[in-house]
Amino acid sequence: PQLRHVLGTMTTNRLTGILSGTLITAAVQSSTATTVMTVSFVNAGLLTLAQAISVIMGANIGTTLTAWIMSAGFSFNITDFVWPAFFIAIILIYSKKRKIIGDFIFGISFMFLGLGTLRQTGIDMDLAHNQPVLDFFASFDPHSFQTTITFLLIGSVLTMCVQSSAAVMAITMILCSTGVLPIYQGIALVMGENIGTTVTSNVAALTANTQARRAAMAHMVFNIFGVLWILCVFRPFIHLVCGWVGFDDMMEKNDPHFVANAAKLSFVLAAFHTTFNL
């Protein structure tokens, strides 16, 4: 009864449901965890279908925070702040009154450490000078609609395989920021990630009741429709996002400002991910 009351308070209307989904996902840094929990609550009869859909919509918004954290990590070494945070967290954990805060900081620090390690691994791979990788991406026409669909499917399959849209987003940012992958293909991968991440909740709902399966399916349909309307205005929408961030998507590699311009690529991907989910 107490859990039912808490969930009911968090989802009294659509706005509070969306806000709850956003905050929970921002805290746990996993939209998959939020959607799977939501589906299980529907299966247990603790949430209605309408309440679950609002929470899932919020989860889509909350997951964009991870993209912004990762994009910021490309501007400075995020791991420099991790070790002091670990130290502070350990002190707080041994304090009875602030143990919960310490546990929270400790968990967030581990997440940042993982993101920093993933970023550094990508840099150490030196993909910008890996000829087979360069040849593979160069074989695609960046202006072709077929290429966009291909990378959308690649993004979906990769996310389904690794079960983490954040990991695929980090890989996409690394490929784009090193100049290996053009921005249009990178954004197509991000769109695919938004579809691939919905598979987990649908798998979790296979043995659930009808309402839970509908909640999981609503997540997939919602994201697929989002991708379809973006495809209709693909390039104008990207130009709009690039203009907002201040990125010149037409700049050539021999331009003296190319490196400074490429540094904004991770922010373009994060901005697109946010506007797409909003």
Please place each PLM-identified region on the residue numbering:
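Hydrophobic core segments of alpha-helical transmembrane domains in multi-pass membrane transport
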Residues: 21-25, 85-95, 107-118, 152-159, ...
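Alpha-helical transmembrane segments of multipass membrane proteins
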Residues: 66, 162, 166, 197-200, ...
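Alpha-helical transmembrane segments of multi-pass inner-membrane proteins
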Residues: 16, 20, 53-54, 98, ...
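Helix-loop-helix hairpins and the membrane-proximal interhelical loops
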Residues: 1-14, 18, 105-157, 175
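Transmembrane alpha-helical segments and their short flanking loops
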Residues: 115, 122-123, 127-142, 206-278
